Amino acid sequence: MAIRTLLLSWLVRLMSSTWRVRWTDQGPLEEALKTGPVIFACLHGDLLLVAGTHRAWSPTVMVSLSQDGSLLAGVLGHLGYGVLRGGSSKGGAAVLRGAVRQVEEGRSLLITVDGPRGPAGEPKAGALSLSRLSGAPVFWVRGRAERCWRAGSWDSFVVPWFFSRVHMQCGRLAGTADEDGEERRQRLARVLA
């Protein structure tokens, strides 16, 4: 597994170095990062796009305890990301405590809000709960690659081709951490759609 994660991380690093990335609305994120950590929220299918374009901000990534999660954790570790293992179905309370600790220590977090099992595009409450407990703002992130391969998996995982144009967009989730969780979760689903 160690050789496989090393090779995959090398491939991701090589591929993402050839992408022609264009950001929209990045200013508010950069301002927020000057004042403290943020919670990045993306869809599971966009994880490679986000991981390939967020290394400069080096967030800790929440990764499930599954076997696929072990492979992903190894790849992300080789790419220089911190990794926090656990998820909504296994280790949820412990990973939430660990995530709050990461934010208190000044580290931003990256959460795939519809993972690890879906349904695709339907955010769970984890990122919003973490925002409420830690006080860190939620920034949604989405991407689109002009040329890519989409996996036949539940999340239609996106793998941009070498030299693809990648369009990234992010924004602060409107509202406050104290407002109704369901309303905020639906707002997150709309901006990530």
Segment roles from a protein language model:
Residues 10-37, 43-49:
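A short, well-structured juxtamembrane/interface segment
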Residues 24-26, 64, 86-89, 171-173:
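Conserved beta-strand termini and adjacent loop/short-helix elements that scaffold enzyme active sites
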Residues 1-18, 30, 55-57, 78, ...:
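Non-catalytic C-terminal accessory region of glycerolipid acyltransferases
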Residues 35-90, 134, 149-151:
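Catalytic core of membrane glycerolipid acyltransferases/transacylases, capturing the structured
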Residues 1, 26-27, 35, 66, ...:
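Short, structured coil/loop segments at alpha-helix boundaries
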